[in-house]
Amino acid sequence: MAPLHQVVAQVWKPVSNLYQAKYVVCITNNREEADIIGYQVDVEYKASKAGYIYLAPIWYSKGTPVYFTKDPTVADLKLYWTKDQSEVLWKH
């Protein structure tokens, strides 16, 4: 049985000077799934050690909410694109 998923945000990531790609920010309790389906990002995730965060291309969800894990609290979540944490992509 596949783990349930939960979309916590939608973000735009610059792909080039011409356009941006839309991604859904997802939380899953399956590390392998996060590595395979999405793009691992550097995060500061204090609310729950059980969740892994990844970005899935918007087309992966086919316009519907992406499936997800037990409902982790995202009260103290920061998402970064860069390893030096210079750019806060999304903060909840």
Cite the ranges covered by each PLM segment.
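Repetitive, compositionally biased segments used for assembly/scaffolding
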Residues: A2-H92
